[in-house]
């Protein structure tokens, strides 16, 4: 996919040219042709790593045609060129051809697509040949004899016609050699043999991939190309092979992790922006999912295109957020928000799910699979025998590879990386500890990885808890919290984590501390929630760690995101399922706070659902005292009716159950002779 500065996109090697309108003036058409020609001629042969001969020939033809267009413009100004249909038709066809040539040249110089364009140089040559011959066809229809042009210009036209008609563009000889080498590398990978590094460097140098950062761009492009559109098995296999090859090159051959100053500044700016933003601002108000295609309504509010389109298709002509009637339902792309979402996704390893996109998760070919294993074995070796700098480089690669790829997680676990990472967790070098902890966090998502991390005696868990409490950097402690979340998904591990005396207090400390941002707090919160959900015996440990007052104080703060509020309310709701948890929540004003949040218009439906669950559990365990206190609140019924009609994931049923409970209480209270709910204990609810 190619992204233009305006935010529009097109698939590589596709040429969506637009025909000039039939009513276009001759002056406008010629001016536009000259502008297009100028853009084409701004490309220089040195910018191209493949198909250089075809490029040179094409640029030469365009340069010649510029003389023709400039003479046309002069003759038009003096009124000697009639704007006949044949003239307009011929020049319009040339305009379309020039648009396609511009697209093709853009593709040939596409940053990140150099390896892909090399392997498709035959197809690229065919495109150059077809477009060049089309120039001859278009000029054939131009009425040269009826237009008063200088003789030398007419000769140039005939010259271009002859040359373009006989165009035999074909792949360059050097390109063919490089392609053969790449296929030879694939063959070696299939047989689990490491290719000669000098041969790989020769190919990489030919296409202009000379730095670690260049490999990153190639990988990003290939991942995008694999994920979009329908492709044949042959195309998927080639793309997968290229992905395995370029990952091998990045990790094994071009190991100097580099970032240009300009790119580094941009990445740091993006990182600062991502850390400061509220991720819920990137969610569609309708679907509550992070938007993949944000658009703006007339009201100024942004929604995901698919969600707002369904809203309009259902007969609604109002803004979902304000309820105001819209004069226009025109949708305008919100490129600013889209760029922020792309930066957020990149920094957090989020793969945006888009319709028609294939998830890039496994190797689709034998060569790619074996290349991945060779890469993993190399990195595992660097952790054991490499010096400090080589170890850091290997750790960074492991961290990157395991961020979103289940395939590389599996390869690295098989290669024995987990054991090496666990050994260096106690490193005095903060860089080593942070990257090792990040790698463990990612590998804890793998089933086999979980087993190896925990170890036979649970020693791995104790190491992670050490980092959680005493890690050199906040980031290391945050990754430790996230690792505990993934590991706690298994009941036995959840029990083992709970039995480590410093584990739960360490998580609560992150939630409570002002030194951590929302992202770190959410990592700790979801870990606590997982420990609570997967091992009920952990509830008393979590209660003893003081989680209830910490969460209630946190939710009262206006500085946290809705996501933190939702996670906090979910834990409180679960704690209220137990009598001691219910008492702790009530004694600290949890009932009043939940009612307040439920009636707020500034929190998400998910947060309100957790509020309903908390209120329901408080009423179930607190008896008539709690139900009575809740029934006295004049706003509660309206909030519950809204929640029951909008509720998802069981939230609506819980709201309805709570409404029924309040109604039954009120009927028993007012009806003659009706029994009152048994009062098992007295609790001050408000």
Swiss-Prot record:
U-box domain location: 277-351
Record SMART domains: ARM, Ubox
Record's keyword terms, sorted: Repeat, Transferase, Ubl conjugation pathway
Gene Ontology BP term (one): regulation of seed germination
This enzyme's EC code(s): 2.3.2.27
Gene Ontology MF terms in the entry: ubiquitin-protein transferase activity
Pfam family, one: Arm
EC class (word): transferase
PANTHER family xrefs: U BOX DOMAIN-CONTAINING, U-BOX DOMAIN-CONTAINING PROTEIN 19
Function description: Functions as an E3 ubiquitin ligase.
Protein name, UniProt field: U-box domain-containing protein 19
Organism annotation: Arabidopsis thaliana (Mouse-ear cress)
Gene name of this polypeptide: PUB19
